[in-house]
Design a protein with these regions (language model features):
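Non-catalytic linker/capping segments at the edges of enzyme domains
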Residues: 1-52, 149-237, 297, 324
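HotDog/MaoC-like acyl-thioester-processing domains
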Residues: 2-12, 97-180, 278, 287-328
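Hydrophobic beta-strand core residues of beta-sandwich domains
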Residues: 7-10, 23-24, 59, 89, ...
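Structural beta-strand/beta-sheet cores of well-ordered domains, especially the beta-sheet scaffolds
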Residues: 20, 87, 125-127, 204, ...
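Intrinsically disordered, low-complexity coil segments
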Residues: 45-56, 115-119
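Hydrophobic beta-strand-centered segment that forms part of the acyl-chain substrate-binding groove
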Residues: 50-111, 245-289
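A beta-strand-loop signature enriched in Asp, Gly, Thr, and Trp
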Residues: 236-240, 265-267
Length: 328
């Protein structure tokens, strides 16, 4: 389908699984790190990664993994106008460099937006995305909601708005086993200076320095993201930055404020509260909502509120992201 499906071309149960598989390489990892600037230690330090995880290759950055997975799903949302939220993203396995990712995308809900005078009709599409590796091992299983335009001339049915999408992702399954259970926390602590996990972090609010958004289309291309709004300014008058780019910068800022984060275990919620454009300057306010000891360290419940600097008015909030990170 040239240009991708419109909202009314989709049906619940429809599957998109023909995106190219992607082998994670050191080159991809380097380009990704150059764009988002993340400082997670294990993806950057192959020796440390081997000592902690026991894997034969360096751990792939979790942001690279979810960016590739999301990019593979854009066959269904090439015409997307906005991506509203993600739900239930949790790592069932942490890939390493050399692993190959395959993603299956299924339409699980459709809801037409209420018609507005002077605006073309649109609808919300809820998608379930399942990512496996070359050995059919589950990596990710999560949901997102995208707003798509309806086809020209499509008459919205005001009698039947569609599915209730409020519960999308609420029943996302937890991993069958902890993918970090065999990681060596003591090896990390021996090699990396403190501070390490401290339950007293709960309640802390940290404020980041800022980052300019650059190389936005390059990140989209790197991760197979073909949503036209990230590449073609004619779609909405200005290219919209891929939401994962904003998330990537938020995580990079978190790693500067908490330099001994080990990895991201999963997301509780992720809402794009405003648009981001190339050249915007973003900063974040990081709330440590919880700090819970686990067998090999601690799990930090984090909330990142990201803002875009404005020259002419109040700074705009653009992201509200709750996630859980592992700290040793």
């Amino acid at each position: 389908m040239s240009g991708g499906p419109y909202f009314d071309d989709l049906a619940v149960g429809q599957v998109f699984d023909s995106a190219p598989a992607v082998t994670l390489t050191a080159g991809m990892a380097a380009v990704h790190q150059a764009i988002v600037g993340d400082r997670l230690r294990l993806p950057l330090d192959a020796d440390l990664s081997a000592a902690v995880t026991g894997a034969p290759a360096a751990l792939a950055h979790p942001g690279l993994v979810w960016d590739v997975a999301i990019g593979q799903t854009t066959l269904a949302t090439q015409r997307v106008k906005a991506n509203l939220f993600y739900r239930g993203l949790v790592f069932h396995r942490f890939p390493v460099i050399g692993d190959t990712l395959y993603t299956r995308t299924e339409v699980v809900g459709l809801r037409a937006n209420r018609p507005k005078p002077g605006r073309a009709p649109t609808g919300l599409t809820a998608l379930r995305m399942t990512t496996i590796d070359q050995a059919d091992r589950l990596v990710l299983d999560f949901y997102r909601c995208a707003m798509l335009p309806a086809s020209p001339g499509w008459p919205p049915d005001e009698e039947r708005a569609g599915d209730d999408l409020s519960g999308v992702g609420a029943d996302a399954a937890a991993p069958a086993h902890d993918p970090t259970a065999d990681w060596d926390a003591e090896a990390f602590r021996r090699r990396v200076p403190g501070p390490h996990f401290d339950a007293g972090l709960a309640g802390t609010v940290l404020h980041s320095s800022a980052d300019v958004v650059s190389s936005a289309p390059e990140l989209a291309r790197l991760t197979l993201n073909i949503a036209a709004t990230h590449h073609d300014s004619r779609i909405s008058g200005r290219r919209l930055v891929y939401g994962g780019h904003t998330i990537g910068l938020a995580l990079a800022q978190a790693t500067r404020m908490l330099p001994n984060l080990v990895t991201v275990l999963g997301w509780q919620s992720c809402d794009h509260t405003g648009p981001v454009y190339e050249g915007d300057t973003l900063y974040s306010e990081l709330h440590v909502e919880s700090a819970c000891p686990v067998d090999n360290g601690g799990a930090l419940g984090l909330r990142s509120l990201v803002y875009a600097v404005s020259d002419s008015g109040p700074d705009r909030q653009v992201l509200d992201w709750r996630f859980t990170a592992l700290q040793f």
